[in-house]
Structure formats: C-alpha cells, structure tokens
C-alpha cells in the first residue's frame, strides 16, 4: 500500500491535520493502528480529544490511517502516517528518541512526504515550533527525492500570513500549501496534490 508520511517538529499540528484530513477524505470513523493495535473512534472529534494536545511529544508512536482518495482513475487506498515530532537536538526522554528513530526509519520507505511547519511561528526565532535545522534537512531531502509537499499550518493564527511569506522565501523551489488543521483551509489543494502523485 502506498504510504504518505506526515513529518515536522513537535506541536506543529501533524496529528490534528491527519485526523481532520481523514474526515475530509470521507472517513466516517477514525480507525487508527498504533503500537501493533487497532483502535477506532466513532467521530473525528472523539479522536481529537484523546490524541491531540498542546503538550510537545504527545505522539510517541506511529499512527497509521488507511484512507481512500478519489481521483479521475477511481479510488486509491493509501496509508497516512502521523509521526512523532522531530527536534533539532537529542531529546532526554528515551521514549521521544525512539519515536524519532521510528519516524526517520519510515522516511525512505514512504512514497510521499507531507512536511508540516507552524506558519505562525516562522517569524519567531527561538519559539520551539519555529522552523529549525531539522526542517532544513527535511526540505533538502524532500526536494531531492520529489513527491514532497510543504504544509504551512496554523494559517488561522495571528502572524501566519507573514510566516507563510517567510517560509516561501526560506524554502524555495518546492510546492507549498497554506493549511489550517482547525478550519480545513487548504485541504482541497492537499487532496489535489496527493491525487496527482500517489
């Protein structure tokens, strides 16, 4: 099955995006596989309440959603994988380090990469969510291999538009979509991009 990996720093909105995008694609219930077990929530809101947090490193295991995306050639099934946040430094926690190892291990095994930034933090150097060296490395990796889309998330927050412009300047030559995991902004563009490349 084709795999699409959602990567980025902690607290940029990867889990919320993954859950809401699954709903946008027509998933009525959220069925998620993680740590070798499958779990189901009756609604995306239930899953969001349990899985999304303002705390960094809430996602410590790869979370796999099997979804269908409709295109001109019919419907295609793919796996959307929500990952633990990657950091510029080595985390003290062994659980967080393992989550990062798991994420990096899937980079080369995934057909498509969705790299998420917090657009509202782009212009705030020193903010934990601000783009850092790990984002630069993901950008270069994605640009070199193709099948890569940069997502500037949190466009519903103050400062995000300026952050979007700055991200376009810092990360040139790759497709970028302004999204909001909260409002659904940009989901149609992401879907179109995936339809073309999956």
Where are these regions (language model features)?
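Charged, alpha-helix-enriched surfaces in structured cytosolic catalytic cores
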Residues: 12, 16, 95-98, 184-185, ...
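Canonical P-loop GTPase G-domain recognition
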Residues: 156-198
